[in-house]
């Protein structure tokens, strides 16, 4: 009986030892698993930190690149030809505005032709140069002196064409010893035929001769010409 009791106690002790060993093994396994989990977690944290550092460095580089002025792309880099619509050939051309041409009336044409036939073109005729005679100041004639001339001379002067004033040589002023009396110049006898018409008084002043003064020398003065006479 004692042997059986001892054997039971030994079996119980072995069972307890096995249980303790199993418990210790489980604890060891749990500890190892916990260590592995801790190492895995630590590795993950380290990798996350490395990734964050890499992202920060990349962001800093991109910020530095954007700070420099970059050439902006053109709005239209490639200009394409604008398509024009092709007009059909059956379209009529645009209506043109009629141009008004000035027309002359037959009466105006007749008047212009009649004037050309009545008034012929005048041609300048050579006028012989006559020697100039010195005159004293105050020798210009007035309209009252024209009455002295005869009527045929007046009629001949009416048809005379105004000619340019002849050029006379200029001399130095010379002192006069005595004042000569006023004399009437002879009327030139050369008369050029011209159609009868009224001559204005301003045209008569074109006939001028030089006048010799005591200080001024030669200067033009009006030549005696008869007033305009219009026969009825």
Swiss-Prot record:
Keywords: Glycoprotein, Milk protein, Phosphoprotein, Secreted, Signal. Mammary gland specific. Secreted in milk. InterPro entries: Casein (IPR001588), Casein_beta (IPR016345). Residues 1-15 form the signal peptide. Residues 48-74 are annotated as: Disordered. The modification Phosphoserine is found at residues 24, 30, 32-34. The modification Phosphothreonine is found at residue 27. The gene is CSN2. It comes from Sus scrofa (Pig). Glycans are attached at residue 22. The keyword Glycoprotein applies. Residues 48-63 have a biased composition (Basic and acidic residues). GO terms for cellular component: extracellular space. Belongs to the beta-casein family. This is Beta-casein. Its main location: secreted. It is found in: Secreted. The keyword Signal applies. Important role in determination of the surface properties of the casein micelles. Pfam families: Casein.
């Amino acid at each position: 009986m004692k042997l059986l009791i001892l054997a039971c106690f030994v079996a119980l002790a072995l069972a307890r030892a096995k249980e303790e060993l199993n418990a210790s093994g489980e604890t060891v396994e749990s500890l190892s698993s916990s260590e592995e989990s801790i190492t895995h977690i630590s590795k993950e944290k380290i990798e996350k930190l490395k990734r964050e550092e890499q992202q920060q460095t990349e962001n800093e580089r991109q910020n530095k690149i954007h700070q420099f002025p970059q050439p902006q792309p053109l709005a239209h880099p490639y200009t394409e030809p604008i398509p024009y619509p092709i007009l059909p050939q059956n379209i009529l051309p645009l209506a043109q505005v009629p141009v008004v041409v000035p027309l002359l009336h037959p009466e105006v044409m007749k008047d212009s032709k009649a004037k050309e036939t009545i008034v012929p073109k005048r041609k300048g005729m050579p006028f012989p140069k006559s020697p100039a005679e010195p005159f004293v100041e105050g020798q210009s004639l007035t309209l009252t002196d024209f009455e002295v001339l005869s009527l045929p001379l007046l009629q001949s002067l009416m048809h005379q064409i105004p000619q340019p004033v002849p050029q006379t040589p200029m001399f130095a002023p010379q002192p006069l010893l005595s004042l000569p009396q006023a004399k009437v110049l002879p009327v030139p006898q050369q008369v050029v035929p011209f159609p009868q018409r009224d001559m204005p008084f301003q045209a008569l002043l074109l006939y001028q001769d030089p006048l010799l003064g005591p200080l001024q020398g030669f200067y033009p003065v009006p030549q005696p010409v008869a007033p305009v006479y219009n026969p009825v």
